[in-house]
């Protein structure tokens, strides 16, 4: 499974990429919407895991675009915990809306990674 991770916080980006790689996923990282759009134009992905508070815009715009143009599974990973924000995320096309700090088990389930794939 090839996953595009869009996250502006370096440590979070690195941890997500490392844990997903240990589960057998191929990960590509982007630190903002501009980088993510470039990656989406260059290669195909099975899923998008994106923060919503990005330095160059709202990650929900990226989610909506990726769903429309590429049909990707989209998972929000965000600090936006309010119910209204969750509703906005689901309307924009998020298949799953996970809040930070991320429960990696929930992320694996959202991506459909079988439990026997270990991140340890």
Predicted feature locations:
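Active-site residues of response regulator receiver
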Residues: 51, 78
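Conserved acidic carboxylate
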Residues: 7
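Two-component/phosphorelay signaling modules centered on CheY-like receiver
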Residues: 10-28
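Short amphipathic alpha-helix used as the core "switch/output" element in two-component signaling
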Residues: 60-72
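Acidic, metal-coordinating helix/loop segments flanking the phosphotransfer/catalytic sites
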Residues: 29-47
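Alpha4 helix (beta4-alpha4-beta5 surface) of REC/receiver domains from two-component response regulators
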Residues: 61, 81-96
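Acidic catalytic/metal-coordinating carboxylates
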Residues: 32, 58-61
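C-terminal output helix
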Residues: 84, 102-111
């Amino acid at each position: 499974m090839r996953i595009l991770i869009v996250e502006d916080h370096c440590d979070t980006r690195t941890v997500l990429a490392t844990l997903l790689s240990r589960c057998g996923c191929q990960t590509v990282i982007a630190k903002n919407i501009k980088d993510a759009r470039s990656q989406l134009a260059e290669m195909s992905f099975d899923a998008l895991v994106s923060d919503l508070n990005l330095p160059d815009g709202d990650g929900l715009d990226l989610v909506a675009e990726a769903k429309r143009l590429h049909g990707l599974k989209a998972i929000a990973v965000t600090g936006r915990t309010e119910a209204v924000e969750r509703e906005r995320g689901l309307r924009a096309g998020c298949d799953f809306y996970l809040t930070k700090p991320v429960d990696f088990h929930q992320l694996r389930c959202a991506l459909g990674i079988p439990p026997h794939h270990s991140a340890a």
